[in-house]
A protein has these predicted regions:
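A generic structural motif
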Residues: 14, 230, 273-275
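A general structural motif
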Residues: 9, 139, 253-255
Length: 285
């Protein structure tokens, strides 16, 4: 109220993370921890479809991971770690970490750390790309949970307390590039004969248009591949659906990998990306 009285021209909120509710149907900015505190990483897109106002500005999202500067963890008796000390002093979220990535399921500390970092990268990549695809429709911006730790911690940061990058640091930088190509998130498992339709979008945050943008998509599986090419202009500061990957899952064991490459022919700018995760044929096991 003091802020409102001082400057009524500026909107004010009591605090962030308030979902829409009666009588304040707009809510405030959102804290959406899909893939960590609830659900899966792709559930952010589901929430956006069902309640668009929840993603107008998302100010917290991500997943915790073990940092590279990790002497404080104490792993001389791996996999036995002092979880009480880590929870009290170093933000170790035992209830979640030990369900998703129980230390005793990993032979080494290094394998445990790498797995948590790869998962964090997956969550941030999927959700940043989702929010950018929804640019202005309705997303006006986002801020993932933590950039850098102020002290030794197992947290959602992408830089640890020594400013050593985690795996997610490069992932975030790539996902926040001025021009990206984004495809719909595929299911984790598929069966032979299933039909996949994944919409492909080009996001252009530059102040200049992409006059002749091309997207090349390639699906690869054991012994074969299928390709698609889409193209067209993309205005400055805009998002355009350039095409749809329409794939019938092959009758083969193993993984199906989908890769995308976006090229601005005139500017000779190229962006490549691999779809998050693998499509695993359910017959593989």
């Amino acid at each position: 109220r003091a802020f409102e009285r001082s400057d009524p021209s500026r909107p004010t909120i009591a605090h962030s993370g308030v979902p829409p509710h009666l009588p304040q149907l707009d809510g405030t900015d959102s804290h959406l921890w899909f893939g960590w505190r609830q659900g899966a990483a792709g559930d952010l897109a589901v929430r956006a479809r069902r309640l668009p106002r929840m993603v107008r500005f998302v100010s917290e999202f991500g997943a915790d991971s073990v940092p590279n500067s990790a002497d404080f963890v104490g792993v001389s008796r791996w996999p036995h770690i002092d979880v009480e000390r880590l929870a009290t002093d170093h933000r170790y979220d035992r209830e979640i970490v030990e369900v998703m990535f129980p230390p005793d399921a990993f032979e080494t500390f290094e394998a445990w750390r790498a797995t948590t970092q790869r998962y964090q990268s997956h969550v941030l990549k999927v959700q940043i790309e989702t929010l950018r695809r929804l640019k202005y429709r309705p997303t006006g911006g986002f801020c993932f949970s933590i950039l850098a730790d102020p002290h030794p911690a197992i947290s959602a940061s992408v830089l640890d307390h020594e400013r050593v990058p985690k795996d997610a640091y490069e992932t975030v930088r790539d996902a926040c590039a001025p021009v990206i190509v984004v495809a719909g998130l595929p299911p984790d498992w598929v069966s032979p004969g299933d039909r996949l339709r994944l919409d492909v979008h080009l996001v252009n945050d530059r102040r200049t248009p992409l006059d002749d943008a091309r997207v090349h998509a390639t699906a690869t599986w054991a012994g074969d591949r299928q390709t698609w090419t889409f193209g067209g202009p993309v205005d400055a500061d805009d998002v355009v659906q350039v095409g749809t990957i329409d794939l019938t899952v092959p009758d083969t064991l193993g993984e199906v990998l989908i890769e995308l490459a976006a090229i601005d022919v005139k500017a000779r700018v190229e962006r490549k990306q691999r779809l998050p995760g693998w499509l695993r044929n359910s017959r593989a096991g």
